[in-house]
Swiss-Prot record:
SUPFAM superfamilies: beta-sandwich domain of Sec23/24 (SSF81995), ENTH/VHS domain (SSF48464), SH3-domain (SSF50044). This is Class E vacuolar protein-sorting machinery protein HSE1. Residues 401-419, 450-470, 499-508 have a biased composition (Polar residues). The gene is HSE1. The lineage of its organism: Eukaryota, Fungi, Dikarya, Ascomycota, Saccharomycotina. One of its GO terms (molecular function) is ubiquitin binding.
Length: 508
């Protein structure tokens, strides 16, 4: 195994104890150098890493552990076998078992071992890392920092009753507030006077009895609106909320005894209480002090602008000799820490507003979908329009009615002529009306209509040129027109007449 100065220099730079956080640019540079020759350079890199892990510098050990993870994830199976070897896992356990090593470093070692064991779980040849994790958990259970996830137990009935009472009280107060706002225009001046008197009385009582005022403030119930994550939590079910250590979660409601519902970065879900710590709301005095500091920073805006203009106009001149620039710089420099805090605070507020906007957009989309689904369901379930019911239209007084025509409507008459049923209550066209009147004038008795002679003549008659004409024989029985058969006048039965088909055809 030959030496590789470039690899050694890159490892020393990536694991420099002066680094307070991991520099992934340096870590990737080491990975690129090792991947050129994974077998030779990999062994050399592991030798240097082992030497730096045995140092007593905690910061160097933390940076080296990050390098180990980077090599395992980016440099292939050669480095994975070297990292999961019995020799290297023994070095990691030696760090955990050393009483002089800080507990934070030991927990970081266990965290890296857990990450590598989870990454190597599909390869049986890399089982030593999994064995090391089990060994550390058995011998040093105090290093397992993450608490157990509690079970989702329903809230007790007393708690539910208490929440119902709180909800009813909130509704009552909101109604009272609404009534007050409705009548405020009528009694605005007397109310202002009463409020001023009450405020003066409260101030006098606080001056005379400051202890009572503090006790009342302490007795006021604290409402937890935000919590901060103490550990990482990965959701295992669909309704759970995943978060990282340090995330700020907005509390929505209590779902179970040990689980609350919250929002984070536009996501909504439940989270265990033993993974978070409440964020106390600042008092009125703290808010006033914070506003005063912000106003002091904003008051220096003109000086900052003047300093920028002076520096821009100075160009290449020696600004150290300019007394005005030195004075402006001296007045602006003290507010730099406060500006950094304000940037973080307003960045968090912006993130919260963006998260709320996303939640509102999702709720609006869901509402529109439900509304559309409900309207479609109502449209499909609506009953069909009821058919028109009423007396059939009767012809005018100028058209005479025959005894048979009174039992059939104009629609049925047209059906008997053409053989095609029309829609109910449809009136015939003028041409059809003329044909109906002609047929009424030459109408025969019912017995003759059903006679064989008329049946044969109707079959042979194909010269009709009316609208929608399809030659069909007449029905041998009277059509049903919505009336009972008893209402048809009785007809005397007649014997069928004997006739000659040839003579009948000649007559036509």
């Amino acid at each position: 195994m030959s030496s590789h100065p470039k690899v050694k220099k890159a490892i020393e730079r990536a694991t420099d104890p002066g680094l307070r956080v991991d520099n992934w640019g340096y870590l990737i540079e080491v990975c690129d150098l090792v991947k050129v020759d994974a077998e030779d350079r990999g062994q050399y890199a592991m030798k240097i890493i082992e030497e730096r892990l045995l140092k007593q510098d905690a910061n160097m050990i933390l940076r080296t552990l990050s390098l180990v993870v980077a090599l395992a994830e980016n440099c292939g199976s050669r480095l994975q076998q070297a990292i999961s070897s019995k020799h290297f896992t023994g070095i990691l356990y030696k760090i955990v078992d050393d009483s002089q090593v800080h507990v934070a470093v030991k927990r970081e070692v266990l965290k890296v071992v857990h990450q590598l064991a989870d990454s190597f779980k599909n390869d049986p040849s890399l089982k030593y890392m999994h064995d090391l994790e089990s060994k550390i958990k058995i011998s040093h259970p105090e290093l397992i920092s993450e608490p157990r996830v509690p079970k989702k137990k329903e809230m007790s009935k007393d708690r539910e009753v208490e929440e119902e009472k709180e909800l009813a009280e909130a509704l009552r107060l909101s109604l009272l507030e609404f009534e007050k706002t409705g009548s405020r225009q009528q009694v605005q001046q007397p109310q202002q006077q009463q409020q001023q008197q009450q405020q003066q009385q409260q101030q006098q009582q606080q001056k005379l009895y400051p202890q009572n005022a503090e006790a009342q403030q302490q007795q006021a119930p604290t409402v937890i609106r935000k919590v901060r994550a103490m550990y990482d939590f990965n959701s295992t079910e669909q309704d759970e909320l995943s978060f990282k250590k340090g995330d700020l979660i907005c509390v929505v409601e209590q779902v179970y005894r040990d689980w609350w519902r919250g929002t984070l970065a536009g996501s909504v879900g439940i989270f265990p209480l033993n993974y978070v710590t409440p964020v106390t709301e600042p008092s009125q005095q703290e808010l006033a002090a914070e506003r005063a500091k912000d106003e002091q920073v904003f008051a220096q805006k003109d000086n900052v602008d003047r300093l920028q203009n002076k520096l821009r106009e100075a160009g290449n001149a020696d600004i150290t000799q300019d007394q005005e620039i030195n004075d402006l710089y001296g007045s602006v420099s003290p507010i730099r820490p406060q500006i950094s805090k304000m940037l973080g605070k307003y960045a968090q507020k912006k993130e919260d507003l963006v998260s709320l906007r996303q939640i509102l957009a999702n709720a609006e989309i869901t509402y529109n979908q439900l509304l559309s689904r409900a309207s479609n369901a109502y449209a499909y379930s609506a009953p069909p329009p009821a058919p028109m019911t009423g007396p059939a239209p009767t012809p005018g007084p100028q058209s005479p009615m025959s005894p048979t025509a009174q039992y059939t409507s104009p629609t049925n008459t047209q059906t008997q002529m053409n053989g095609i049923p029309n829609p109910p209550y449809s009136y015939p066209l003028p041409q059809q009306t003329q044909q109906i009147q002609q047929s009424e004038q030459t109408q025969q008795p019912l017995s003759q209509i059903n006679s064989p002679q008329n049946y044969a003549s109707s079959v042979g008659n194909t010269n009709y040129t009316g609208t929608n004409h399809i030659p069909q024989p007449l029905a041998p029985y009277p059509q049903y027109t919505g009336m009972s058969m008893q209402s048809i006048p009785p007809q005397q039965p007649q014997m069928p007449q004997h006739y000659n088909m040839s003579s009948n055809s000649n007559a036509q």
